[in-house]
Amino acid sequence: MLELKFVRAHPEIVRADLTKRGDTEKLAWVDEVLEMDRRARELTVAIGDLRNRRNVISREISQARKAGNDITELLAEAAGLPERIKEVETERETLTEAVRYRLMRLPNILHESVPVGKDDSENVEIRRWGEPEIPAFDLENHGALAVEHGWADFERAAKIAGSGFYFLKGRLALLDMALQRFAMDILVEHGYTPIIPPYMMNRAAYEGVTDLADFENVMYRIDGEDEYLIATSEHPMAAMYCDEIFEEKDLPLRLAGLSPCFRREIGAHGLDTKGLFRVHQFHKVEQFIYATPEQSWDLHEELMANAEEVFQRLGLPYRIVSICTGDIGTVAAKKYDLEVWMPREERYREAVSCSNCTAYQAVRLNIKVRNPTEFTEKRYVHTLNSTAIATSRAIRAILENNQNEDGSVTIPKALRPYLYGSETL
C-alpha cells in the first residue's frame, strides 16, 4: 500500500510508475485519490467547526435565557447540530474508505532497474550457474519414476484428496525432509532465526500482506470461518509484527520460515500435469527480513545469494532473471527469480522468487521503526522475502538432473549426511 502522504507529495511519480507498468486503467485513481482526500480534509475542518459551534451555542443559550431573551432559534439550531455532525462524519468516512480502497490496490513503486516488458517472456536473464546437461538416454518423467520406485503415490492421494495432491513415501519422503533441514541449516549459519508459523491467518491479517482481491482465488478459505490456509510462510512472518514499532538497533531482523504451503489453483502446464511441480500442497523454507530503508537493497542481494548457495551446494544448474514490469505483480518493488534447469523439458523453470517489497506491506500492516535520535519520529520498515527452497520443485529437479540410465538417482553430496550417508535413492 502506498502512503497517502507520498501520493499527495509525488503524484507524478505514481503516474509515471503506472505508465511504466502499462497499468493505465489506474491512472485516473491518482487524481481521484487527491480530490477525495482534499474533500475529506475539508470535511474534517467542517466537523471541527460544527463541534465548536455546538459548544458555543450552549453558552449562548445559557446567556440568552439569563437575559430573558427568546431562545427558540438557538434551541432549533442546537437540536440540529448532532445530526448535521453525523452527516458530515458519514460523508468523510465514505471518502476516506474510497481513498483507502484505491491506495490498497495501487501497485508499489518500482525500482528504476526493473526491466520493462509485457509478460514473463520478457524477463531479463542476469546470470547462469552450472552447465545444463541433456543426457544421452531418455529421461523418465519424475512422477512416473517416483511411482515405479514406490517413492510416491498419486492415485491414492487423488482418491482421498483430489488431483494435485500426493503421498511421498520412503526415500522420497526422507529427501523432502532432508531438503527442508539442509536449507534451514544454511540460513541458520547466516544468522536467520527459524520460525514455524501458524498455518492459518485471519482475513484482516491477510489483507495487510497482499491484495486479497487478486490472491484470494488461489487460497483455501475455512468454510464458516474468517481464516485462510497460508499460501507461504512469508505471509504470517510479514504480519507477525503488525501494529508494532521496531528500534533501529534491532534491524535487520532475519527470519527463516518452514511450513506447508496451500494453493488452490495450480493450472495445467504440459509435462507438469502429473508430478510434483505444480501441486496444491508442498513444503517450503522461506527467508524473510525486516529492515530499514537504507539496508533493504543490499539485503535483497543477500537473500538471492542465500538461495543461490542452496542450489549451488545441491549442484543444480540455474539462471537468475530480473522480473519485468508486466510480470512483477503489485507488491514487489523489484523481484528476481531463480529458475532451475529441467532437462526433460530442456528449459529453466521457476524455483525461487526473491522480492524487495520496500514499505508496501509495512504501510498496510502498520509496522514502523523508531528514529534513534528523534524518539517521536517513526517511519515504515522495509520487508523482503525469498524462497530458500520449495521441496517439491527441488525434488523434481534432482530426479531429472541426477537420474541415471538404470533409473537410479544420485543423491547430491550435500544431502547425504541427512540421508544416512546413502549415495543413491
From Swiss-Prot:
L-serine binds at residues 232-234, 286, 387. SUPFAM superfamilies: Class II aaRS and biotin synthetases, tRNA-binding arm. Keywords: Aminoacyl-tRNA synthetase, ATP-binding, Cytoplasm, Ligase, Nucleotide-binding, Protein biosynthesis. GO terms for molecular function: ATP binding; serine-tRNA ligase activity. It holds the Pfam family Seryl_tRNA_N. One of its GO terms (cellular component) is cytoplasm. The keyword Iron-sulfur does not apply. It is an enzyme of class 6 (ligase). It catalyses: tRNA(Ser) + L-serine + ATP = L-seryl-tRNA(Ser) + AMP + diphosphate + H(+); tRNA(Sec) + L-serine + ATP = L-seryl-tRNA(Sec) + AMP + diphosphate + H(+). Its EC number is 6.1.1.11. Consists of two distinct domains, a catalytic core and a N-terminal extension that is involved in tRNA binding. Homodimer. The tRNA molecule binds across the dimer. This is Serine--tRNA ligase. The gene is serS.
